[in-house]
Amino acid sequence: MTHLQFDNRLRAELPGDPEEGPRRREVLAAWSAVQPTPVAAPTLLAYSADVAQRLGLRAEDLASPRFAEVFGGNALYPGMQPWAVNYGGHQFGHWAGQLGDGRAISLGEAIGVDGGRYELQLKGAGPTPYSRGADGRAVLRSSIREFLCSEAMHYLGVPTTRALSLVGTGDAVVRDMFYDGHPRREPGAIVCRVAPSFIRFGNFELPAARGDVDLLRQWVDFTLARDFPDLPGSGEDRIASWLGQVCERTAVMVAHWMRVGFVHGVMNTDNMSILGLTIDYGPYGWVDDYDPDWTPNTTDAQGRRYRFGTQPQVAYWNLGRLAQALSPLFGDAAPLQAGLDQFRDTYLACDRRDTAAKLGLAECQDEDLHLIDDLRALMREAEMDMTLTFRGLVDLSPQQPDASVLREAFYDETKRAAQAPALGAWLQRYAARCLQDGASDAVRASRMRAANPRYVLRNYLAQQAIDQAEQGDLSGVHALLEVMQRPYDDQPRRESFAAKRPDWARDRAGCSMLSCSS
């Protein structure tokens, strides 16, 4: 028996749907009561020891068959009261109406050993009123990707939801991976993701779009009371301060994405966390050869709305939709604009901080922004790996700058040779700036190692682990989980996990481009 304690404030304090069960319907309330749909043979495949410890779960809890039953959707611990939340959102720039938790079911809000709140949410636990004709299930490949990325991002220092467990269901799920008329049966799985709150921008957009100001205000009052209890003031001033905090947190999150080369892939407003956490890991990816126009999402391949380089602008646009949703609570738009301005100010400050850290400098001067932009242009022209380039610069000697420290970063020898003179000139500029900074080589290297990861969850690494897991071998998943817990360290005998994308993975499904099929 676990010792988890729940208070489930969302269910207790926000209006619920009078109808229970998964029947698809328009819902005018904040949430709907719905039970997970049982599966054939729930089996624990992997778990996060850190998240389990925060929840107070013991080794015997995790080893118990009851744990797999609960987090596979077949049973409940005392105090759990499952629900799915109602929200809307803008998808690819267009209003999509009611969306909601189509295959996510929250089991409860647990109070951890640190006194913090940990909402436990099963993804792939069956249909809800918001499933929109889908089966509410998830396949093993997408579940592995969400489980691993949730944990990898945490250890990279990126604000994120976490993952407690990955449970195989024993059931097959039919999916058309690229929506091309070739569906296939795939093994099913369920991830338990964990966060203090899963409230999204879309929770406020939907009642605003419906003209339901009462429910909008209830959502705002609840969010302030539960998730932002220390905000001072009252009325419009407090709501404006809250929006400013959301804008700041979102800016910090996206700045971290840009620092480590992460591309979310589906930055719809229903995938934006009110806490500034990375949420909903679908067709995400890490930049391999540097390209600000790259997106991993096949659905976005033509318009490239959510490409790597535009993520800050998209985040700002999404915050504008949140501000618009809150506008019925304000007599004047000026406080809302002031909150939005905090995004730009915070993002620019984070960008300067990260520029200095990635280059190993004590502070970022204006010319350093040009220096790093010129490096990015070189990386693009020479087809250089982003992660390996910045990590390789750690070993550069400012006294004798030598491009050989970047030899592992190139994908194309012809392009390397063509850009060699320009790269050499840039290295001379960078070396001079390091000497001007005055820090020792050891201090500079320490700064850079803390900002430039050695290991990131490249798509091809995740796909290799998925291929093994689909054959019943979870060793690849466990190895990746272990390596990604120390992304900034040089790990002996783990060098293969730091290698750039191999040629075979350039165009392979799951390694370069992914769909939303999951």
UniProtKB/Swiss-Prot annotation:
Residues given in the record as ATP binding sites: G100, G102, R103, K123, D135, G136, R193, R200, D280
Region entry Disordered, spans: 1-22
Keywords: ATP-binding, Magnesium, Manganese, Metal-binding, Nucleotide-binding, Nucleotidyltransferase, Transferase
Cofactor: Mg(2+); Mn(2+)
Entry's Gene Ontology molecular function annotations: AMPylase activity; ATP binding; magnesium ion binding
Binding site for Mg(2+): N271, D280
The reaction(s) this protein catalyses: L-seryl-[protein] + ATP = 3-O-(5'-adenylyl)-L-seryl-[protein] + diphosphate; L-threonyl-[protein] + ATP = 3-O-(5'-adenylyl)-L-threonyl-[protein] + diphosphate; L-tyrosyl-[protein] + ATP = O-(5'-adenylyl)-L-tyrosyl-[protein] + diphosphate; L-histidyl-[protein] + UTP = N(tele)-(5'-uridylyl)-L-histidyl-[protein] + diphosphate
Active site positions, chain numbering: D270
A UniProt-annotated Pfam family: SelO
EC number assigned by the record: 2.7.7.-, 2.7.7.108
Known role: Nucleotidyltransferase involved in the post-translational modification of proteins. It can catalyze the addition of adenosine monophosphate (AMP) or uridine monophosphate (UMP) to a protein, resulting in modifications known as AMPylation and UMPylation.
Family the entry assigns: Belongs to the SELO family.
Record protein name field: Protein nucleotidyltransferase YdiU
Species in which this protein is naturally found: Xanthomonas campestris pv. campestris (strain ATCC 33913 / DSM 3586 / NCPPB 528 / LMG 568 / P 25)
Gene name per UniProt: ydiU
